[in-house]
């Protein structure tokens, strides 16, 4: 199941420059809610909001390659988001799939029963494929304005036990 030797560490401020680079790559953020051209201060604020959440940096050979996590949506009801973002140089290597499987296993071990929610736009074929492989079910669609374009967003859900 886990074959790439990826290491996971809770998000912390020491990865600020890595996140700044990640979130200023147009290809990486085009499928996300991250706006373009984040300042280092804006990056720091986003990162600080994640401290204490179930969000991990992903390391390969001690180098930052991405992030994966399940931020709380409603802790009382055990509802969490689900996302991952990887440096463009790491796309197509299977790391996103492995990290996604890892964080779901982590949630099972540490939270027991929970519901994970993920959103994807149709152009993000690779991510939608990963969600389906992991057992996420499409529960609805909506329209959203992402960076000035109206797109259909597919909403997925996974019950974990």
Named regions from a protein language model:
Residues 1-25, 55-161:
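Acyl-donor (CoA/ACP) binding surface of acyl/acetyltransferases
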Residues 27-46:
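Conserved GNAT-fold acetyl-CoA-binding loop/helix
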Residues 47-52:
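Short loop/turn motifs at secondary-structure junctions and domain boundaries
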């Amino acid at each position: 199941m886990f074959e790439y030797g990826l290491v996971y560490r809770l998000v912390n401020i020491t990865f600020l420059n890595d996140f700044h680079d990640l979130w200023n790559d147009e290809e990486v953020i085009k499928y996300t809610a991250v706006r373009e051209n984040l300042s280092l201060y804006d990056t720091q604020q986003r990162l600080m909001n994640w401290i204490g959440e179930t969000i991990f940096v992903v390391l390969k050979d001690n180098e930052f390659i991405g992030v994966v996590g399940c931020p709380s949506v409603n802790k009382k009801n055990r509802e969490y988001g689900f996302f991952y973002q990887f440096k463009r140089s790491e796309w197509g290597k299977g790391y996103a799939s492995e990290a996604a499987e890892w964080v779901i296993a982590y949630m099972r071990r540490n939270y027991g029963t929970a519901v994970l929610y993920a959103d994807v736009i149709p152009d993000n074929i690779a991510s939608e494929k990963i969600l389906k492989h992991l057992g996420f079910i499409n529960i609805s669609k909506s329209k959203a304005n992402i960076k000035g374009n109206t797109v259909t967003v597919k909403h997925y859900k996974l019950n974990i036990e």
